[in-house]
């Protein structure tokens, strides 16, 4: 085996590791506010609000300027390109607002999924071209971590070996480019909850996918201490008739992670995958209470599961700003407790919090 030429200096490694640790400090997780213009259009449409740049800015500002109760809950915020360059009403750029509240600024860098020809509707993710230059610019503009989402589907013949290998490789290339530019990569191989598969099948597929991802990261000389993983929880498919307890979901999830994710990885920030706000908090809490050894921080990187009630409360009306922020603060506090295994559902969750956020074949 040839000598491995070091990809990163000790200083670069320390910077990456420090950033990753800040994002997943105890009690902290990530607000995913990086919906593309097309995705946010659906959210705004659901409350009868026009998808204009100002409405998008106002809504993101609502989340980013919630009062200081969220500061100990939110370690990082993932933004969409447009949002990184928008400003709050007081003239402060959004990255400055996030940093003033102790958060790390993140940016979505992938360019969406594209079909893999010759597969049964499987995809890979595009966006590697020019990524190094974009990362260098984003770093200058205040971003310290990034996100790239790959999508896999469970079916009779999926995910195929080709889809698993291709997506693992593209995640590794992305991670390598980020680290060279001082940006911590969040590696997101999402296995969609679509389908009628049971818990065991999801666990099996999750293990196979994560094993392939970490083999690719090793092949590409990724510094694991300077990365975060954003996986799905192991859950039954949405059309599965059998019901599983939160404890069973937690056990299957932690078991799959223990079998595949090296302890060197700083943190695991779960995606909510269309679970209701309440369900996402309860499952995260159960995962943290699972009686197995867990060497990584296990926390949240939630979009809809932090925003659904806030979005409804806002309803596109400026006068509802405070009420909407209150809903967001509630979910942030709940998930901050859940990532420490200290969340007790109050039974007072509003209707919006208990509503399933599942979207078939979810494109982000």
Swiss-Prot record:
One of its GO terms (biological process) is glycolytic process. There is a cross-link at residue 42 (Glycyl lysine isopeptide (Lys-Gly) (interchain with G-Cter in SUMO1)). The record marks 364 as: Necessary for preference for fructose 1,6-bisphosphate over fructose 1-phosphate. GO terms for cellular component: actin cytoskeleton; cytosol; extracellular exosome; extracellular region; extracellular space; ficolin-1-rich granule lumen; I band; M band. It is an enzyme of class 4 (lyase). It is found in: Cytoplasm, Myofibril, Sarcomere, I band; Cytoplasm, Myofibril, Sarcomere, M line. GO terms for molecular function: actin binding; cadherin binding; cytoskeletal protein binding; fructose binding; fructose-bisphosphate aldolase activity; identical protein binding; RNA binding; tubulin binding. Changing residue 129 to G: In GSD12; thermolabile. It catalyses: beta-D-fructose 1,6-bisphosphate = D-glyceraldehyde 3-phosphate + dihydroxyacetone phosphate. Keywords: Acetylation, Cytoplasm, Disease variant, Glycogen storage disease, Glycolysis, Hereditary hemolytic anemia, Hydroxylation, Isopeptide bond, Lyase, Phosphoprotein, Schiff base, Ubl conjugation. The modification N6-acetyllysine is found at residues 42, 108, 111, 330. The modification N6-(2-hydroxyisobutyryl)lysine is found at residues 99, 147. Its EC number is 4.1.2.13. Homotetramer. Interacts with SNX9 and WAS. Interacts with FBP2; the interaction blocks FBP2 inhibition by physiological concentrations of AMP and reduces inhibition by Ca(2+). In vertebrates, three forms of this ubiquitous glycolytic enzyme are found, aldolase A in muscle, aldolase B in liver and aldolase C in brain. This is Fructose-bisphosphate aldolase A.
